[in-house]
């Protein structure tokens, strides 16, 4: 469905410029200890610095909305959150420290990877192949429309409940970055 996933965000005034600057600090993580983004960040730090990120930070596992609010009120200096919360935060005074694309490059992963997808019960899938194929086709077509049509984005803008144009643009661009071109 999408290659959009977590980015490690930091407050611009935090003086955090690399993963190593997180030593001894709290790092908010949406999900749990087995969250795929957290595991990828750990693999990245091991590959780049020969250090497991879990050994230098104080991980705080919490829900995405809580981390979003903690980053907004500056009570948390760094967090790995879901893409749409990150997009909203990046429209504020918060910057990306490391994006998933940088991690994949470091780990020598060259192709698009789907981080978000659908699962179907095997029996249901076998009994409803046409329905599932139609669903997947509609999903692909809708992504193509949203990838290429500002008019369509403007049509759905009100339904997105964005607070301002900057947040709208951040969500739109984040969604487009998540579209898988080749799988």
Where are these regions (language model features)?
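Pocket-lining segment of extracytoplasmic ligand-binding domains
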Residues: 65-156
């Amino acid at each position: 469905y999408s290659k959009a996933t977590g980015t490690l965000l930091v407050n611009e005034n935090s003086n955090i410029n690399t993963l190593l600057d997180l030593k001894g600090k709290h790092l908010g993580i949406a999900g749990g200890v087995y969250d795929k983004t957290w595991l990828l960040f750990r693999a990245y730090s091991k590959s780049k610095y020969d250090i497991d990120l879990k050994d230098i930070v104080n991980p705080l596992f919490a829900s995405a909305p809580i981390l979003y609010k903690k980053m907004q009120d500056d009570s948390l200096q760094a967090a790995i959150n879901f893409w749409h919360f990150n997009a909203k935060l990046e429209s504020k005074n918060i910057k990306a420290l490391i994006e998933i694309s940088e991690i994949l490059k470091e780990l020598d992963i060259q192709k698009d990877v789907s981080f978000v997808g659908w699962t179907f019960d095997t029996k249901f899938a076998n009994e409803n192949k046409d329905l599932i194929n139609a669903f997947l086709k509609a999903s692909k077509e809708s992504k193509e429309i949203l990838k290429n049509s500002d008019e369509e984005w403007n049509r759905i803008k009100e339904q997105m409940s964005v607070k301002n144009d900057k947040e709208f643009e951040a969500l739109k661009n984040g969604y487009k970055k998540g579209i898988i071109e080749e799988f």
